[in-house]
Amino acid sequence: MRPRLWLLLAAQLTVLHGNSVLQQTPAYIKVQTNKMVMLSCEAKISLSNMCIYWLRQRQAPSSDSHHEFLTLWDSAKGTIHGEEVEQEKIAVFRDASRFILNLTSVKPEDSGIYFCMIVGSPELTFGKGTQLSVVDFLPTTAQPTKKSTLKKRVCRLPRPETQKGPLCSPVTLGLLVAGVLVLLVSLGVAMHLCCRRRRARLRFMKQFYK
């Protein structure tokens, strides 16, 4: 029986959505057109004959929504794709307990909710789903505004002003000149007295030797 027909029959059975047995990551992803996407589904139970289905729901979950079969990974038969699936754009592989759905060159029409599923007896167990949004342009993130740093003011000591004009006042100059004159007069008086004393001594010596 074809997987698509089998799924239509299995959909009439009890369905368990969002079970913790299958953990899907990420919960939401937005990518740009023609990029690659990897969706992960980790099984928390050990099955002897592991078989993981990947389904897509193009519209929001409702009573009228249906699941589109994409591909399955069977431990015995390998990978089986759906009838209307572009096989060159989709691949599924196993990494330990994780099952990876790899989508390449995605388009906006590939947007939807992707579910992984395992078949029990009689119920179907779904993961919580990964919502994929494919857009032509990703929103640009605003650059964080830089905080304006206040510059610290450096307190500078005032420079001593250079004094223009004469360094000394007229009074000071007058005192200096008067001091110089007094010194000159004193020196002259001292020299005069010294000369007189010398002459007096010479006279005394002459009178003594006569």
From Swiss-Prot:
It comes from Homo sapiens. The chain crosses the membrane at residues 171-191. It comes from the Eukaryota. It is a single-pass type I membrane protein. This is T-cell surface glycoprotein CD8 beta-2 chain. Residues 192-210 are cytoplasmic. Residues 1-18 form the signal peptide. InterPro entries: CD8B, Ig-like_dom, Ig-like_dom_sf, Ig-like_fold, Ig_sub, Ig_V-set. It is found in: Cell membrane. GO terms for molecular function: coreceptor activity; MHC class I protein binding. One of its GO terms (cellular component) is cell surface. Residues 19-132 form the Ig-like V-type domain. The keyword Membrane applies. Pfam families: V-set.
